[in-house]
A protein has these predicted regions:
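C-terminal interaction segment
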Residues: 2-3, 11-75, 79-126
């Protein structure tokens, strides 16, 4: 079992000035989710997701999102994707490895911790 989140309600990390760092989409294992209190589950869960996706928007800075990805990885994320629809790239961040950048992939398949998850991306580049 898993707990998956959109940006409306998800896992996050305490961040500067009382703010919460939260990705556009995330995944947390059921075991970790159930270890939280009801109060923690009712708002931004104070934990780092095992898998997350950030999507660059027109109002975002790529450098700031790349720094945010480094924060996620330093805090225990196992896999993270940074999707840049303007540059037509997806940067794959894995624990203990340098990011791998894919140019205009038709799809991307995740490994652990979400083995079997596949995202079709070809429509992003059209």
């Amino acid at each position: 079992m898993v707990a998956a989140f959109s940006s409306a309600r998800m896992a996050g990390l305490p961040y500067r000035m009382g703010r919460c760092l939260s990705p556009d989409a995330s995944w947390v294992s059921y075991e970790r989710w159930n270890a939280l209190t009801d109060k923690q589950q009712a708002s931004y869960a104070p934990l780092c997701p095992e898998f997350l996706i950030e999507i660059l928007s027109a109002s975002d800075s790529l450098k700031i999102l790349q720094a945010k990805m480094d924060v996620w990885m330093a805090n225990g994320a196992k896999l993270a994707w940074l999707v840049d629809p303007y540059g037509a790239t997806i940067a794959i961040y894995r624990a203990g490895a340098a990011p791998e950048v894919l140019q205009k992939p038709d799809s991307i398949e995740a490994g652990e911790p979400v083995a079997g998850f596949r995202l079709t991306t070809s429509r992003l580049w059209a």
